Regions:
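Short functional micro-motifs and their immediate structural scaffolds
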Residues: 63-65, 76
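Long C-terminal interaction/binding lobes of large macromolecular proteins
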Residues: 2, 99-100, 127-150, 154-208
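Extended, structured, electrostatic nucleic-acid-contact surfaces
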Residues: 1-17
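Extended interfacial segments that mediate partner engagement and assembly in macromolecular machines
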Residues: 24, 72-153
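Short cysteine-rich clusters marking metal-coordination/redox-active sites
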Residues: 56-59, 68-71
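Short metal-coordination and nucleic-acid-contact micro-motifs, chiefly zinc-binding Cys/His arrays
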Residues: 49-52, 64
């Protein structure tokens, strides 16, 4: 049996995705072996991110300032929005250096088996953005409405179902719904695709 403080640390680390009890125990003992300064820095970083990071009121990405830097950037095309499942996907696409539109982060995909429906995602906010409102909350980028939504959810069963659902919602709003090309492996996660493959997938997007 672990001492109570260690057991509590293992329990909390075990709540992280992909972390089982054995891995949580290894992480806990790594922290115990770390210097007091490193352990304190880890705790401070966790506290800081919970205190300072929020959702962008425009695109729902994670940000320290609101609206986020991408939504405030007047050099980006406010009429094209790339719809992704997770904040990590924004980072992956930005690494390609070829996309100059804006984003909308759903924070998940439709998964009926897991009890995740449209109300659990940032779908309402996307529809509101595509209904003809300004491109950014602070007015940056002018008042051009969204004309194209690039549906860039991963090509898994859930990702495809989410893209089809969103396309049906957006078409009546006069928004062109396109889907990234299948350069990304079927069943793969967007954040793990290499930069060239991801750039070609966006360039080769197709109508939904």
């Amino acid at each position: 049996m672990f001492a109570s403080p260690i057991a509590r640390l293992v329990q909390q680390l075990g709540k992280l995705p992909g972390i089982g009890e054995k891995t949580a125990a290894r992480l806990a003992f790594h922290i115990l072996r770390a210097s007091p300064e490193d352990a304190a820095a880890l705790a401070a970083a966790i506290a800081e991110v919970k205190q300072k990071i929020r959702f962008c009121s425009v695109c729902c990405d994670l940000t320290e300032s609101d609206p986020c830097a991408i939504c405030r950037d007047a050099r980006r095309d406010p009429g094209v929005v790339c719809v992704v499942a997770q904040p990590q996907d924004v980072v992956a696409i930005e690494r390609t250096g070829g996309y100059r539109g804006r984003y909308h982060v759903l924070h998940g995909v439709l998964s009926p088996l897991d009890g995740i429906g449209p109300d659990d995602l940032r779908v309402t906010e996307l529809v509101a953005r595509c209904a003809g409102g300004p491109a950014a909350a602070d007015g940056s980028g002018g008042d051009q409405s969204i004309r194209e939504a690039i549906l860039a959810t991963s090509p898994s069963v859930e990702g495809e179902a989410t893209a089809v659902y969103l396309a049906k919602l957006l078409r009546p709003l006069g928004v062109r719904a396109t889907r990234i090309a299948t350069g990304v492996p079927i069943g793969g996660e967007l954040e793990y695709a290499d930069q060239v493959t991801l750039a070609r997938a966006i360039d080769g997007r197709r109508e939904m």
